[in-house]
Structures are given as C-alpha cells and as structure tokens.
Amino acid sequence: MPKLLLCALALCLSLPIAVNAETLTSGVDVSHDQGPVDWAKVKGAGVDWAYAKASEGDTVGDQTFATNWPAMKSAGLTRGAYHFYVVGDPPKDQLANFTKHVTLEPGDLPPMVDVERKQHPQGRTAMIADLHEFLSLLKAHYGVTPIVYTEPAFWNANFDGSFSDYPLWVAEYGVRAPRPVTGWTGWTIWQHSESGKVLGINTPVDLDHFKGTLQDLKKLAVPGG
C-alpha cells in the first residue's frame, strides 16, 4: 500500500469516533517541539487546518514560527497562531510579544490563547481579570474573537464562567467526549490526542477536531479571505 495512504489511514485510525455523528474537521497544532514540518505532506495527509505556536508570556518567541507561518499558507492549509499564556505576566506585555510575531491576513484563523498552567502565584480574582484584559486586547488589535484553549481540571479549579463569549478549545485525551468546562455549554475545538502521527511531522503531534465543516471554521477567521 502506498506510504501516503498508510499515513492517511494512521491519522484517521487515531481519531475518536465522531461525537453524536457530528461533522468534524481535522486539524493539528504544533510548536518547536515538533521540529521542522513538511506542510505540503501534512496537507496531503488530510489535515485541513493547523495552528502554530508564536509566542509565550511577555518575552518568549517560538523559534519555528517564522518558518511554519508562511509554509502553512503555501501548502494551502487554513492557518492560525497561538500564544502560550503565562499567569502573572502583564497582559499588555503579552500582547506586545504576540503581535510582534503575528500579522494576520484575511482568511487566517483567530488567535488562540493557551491557558493550561499557573506559572506564578496570583490570586483568582486578579488572574481572571488579567485574562479578560488580554483577550480583550487581542480582539481589539486583530478585529476577531480569540479562542480559549484549556483543559477541564485546570480551568475549573482556577477560572470562572465569565469567558463564554470566547470559543472553547478543550484538551482531553482517551475519552469519547471531553468533560464540561465551567462557563461553556459545549466545545468548538477538541484536542483529543497529544500523540498523533501525521505524514510530514516527525514527532508525535496534537490532533484536533473542529465541530463543523471547514467552511464553518472559516466563519471564525479574519474577514475577507
């Protein structure tokens, strides 16, 4: 059997059964952990969209983003960029770090904010206020509503239900459906594996489902694409 077909089958077999038989559109998210990526092969393996890490906190940039970002577009993938949020770093400084690396074009997906770790001690009230500020700053800068990425146990222990205006990207593995996350009635994107195998990526990679078609996903993107 041709190698490309084998890899495409491996990707399909690693996905959970569709939740309630809904339409799900496959994507991946990457960072420097994945090393060099052959995005043309990723696209050929049946991946429709992808996110690449751009920045972390108020100073760190991902060293692979400058290569990944144009290559994703050249390969024909619907692309997005994400920021690894650092609790305790000033929201305005985190915005400056992300915008230094990311210029969005029409058709690009909205920024995703990865909220999964409490790096510095901070009271719950201040932590919630800072995240609201950062998300509002992102929305004002790019003109699209950012996506919140998190995992149920961390979010439910540290945040409240006041973020439901933002689409939810939930991470939970080895289950038929992710647990509820405080504030949301359902998820928009589900990261269902952190150990996927995809042609063009030489290391395990995060696999994601968007709940809907690719055209539905593009409705979240920067207008004009």
Where are these regions (language model features)?
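Positively charged n-region of N-terminal signal peptides that target proteins for export
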Residues: 1-5
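Bacterial N-terminal signal peptides
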Residues: 7-16
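Substrate-binding cleft of extracellular glycoside hydrolase catalytic domains
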Residues: 22-40, 52-144
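Functionally critical loop-and-helix segments that line ligand-binding/catalytic clefts
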Residues: 22-32, 163-225
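Sec/Tat-exported extracytoplasmic proteins
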Residues: 46, 54, 73-76, 102-106, ...
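Structural detector of well-ordered beta-strand residues that form the stable sheet scaffold
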Residues: 80-82, 112, 147-149, 169, ...
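Aromatic-lined carbohydrate-recognition surfaces of secreted/lumenal glycan-active proteins
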Residues: 143-155
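Beta-rich nucleic-acid/ligand-interaction surfaces
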Residues: 153-163
